[in-house]
Amino acid sequence: RHCKMFNDFYGLTGRPFQLTPDPTFYFESLTHRKALSYLSYGLAQGEGFVVITGEVGAGKSTLVAHLMATIDPARLTAAQIVTSKLDGEELVHVVAQAFGLIVDGHDKASALGAIEAFLHDEARAGRRCLLVVDECQNLDLAALEELRMLSNFQLGSHPLLQCLLLGQPEFRRTLAHHPGLEQLRQRVIASHHLDAMEPSEVGAYVEHRLALVGWQHAMHPGAHLS
């Protein structure tokens, strides 16, 4: 109710700073522009892992939502999962569900078979497959190893699945230093850490989001943003 009164008073048509990622509000700061270039390069390779890390609120999910909005579904089939504390077997079933697959049986082998058959069908139809995995810091080593194994699926010499991994800074550290992740590290073809926005960009960012919900007033040049 208070939010509606606030919006009515200022003539806003929506919530400019809602927490849910919305590609409409994407603002290309310097660090996001760099991340998008790494993403574009990585996805063009069509294989391996692309890694984007950043603090909570850095804009990882909004960046990916912006990217997803530009994807041609006739050429790329994308699925996204937000991970909790999953082990390897649970992860495989979650991936199958994300691609809309019905798995006969509850064992890992059945889920893997369904995923591989699906990836082969998509490849024959001329579509690449992308799996976006959010909150990767929640995954244990067994689950990360399952992701690496999924990325091994091929049709001839053609990789069938590419993975985009999103995580908080602790995932970046784990990926860089854990001895059990050496093979996964070798499969990373592009990575970027989202830094904080430059102080000089904050005003433009606020105005950008306000303008998208109907704000028609100029911000005072001396306005203090904190």
Outline where the language-model segments fall.
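A short, basic N-terminal segment
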Residues: R1-G46
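Conserved NTP-binding/hydrolysis module of P-loop NTPases
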Residues: L12-F17, R75-L76, L86-G105
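Walker A/P-loop nucleotide-binding motif
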Residues: G46-H66
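Conserved catalytic segments around the Walker B and adjacent sensor/switch elements
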Residues: V50, P73-T83
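Central P-loop NTPase core of STAND/AAA+ ATPases
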Residues: G100-G126
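Helix-loop-helix "sensor" segment of P-loop NTPases
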Residues: L101, D121-G126, L130, L155, ...
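Conserved Walker B catalytic segment
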Residues: E116-H120, R124-L165, E170-R173
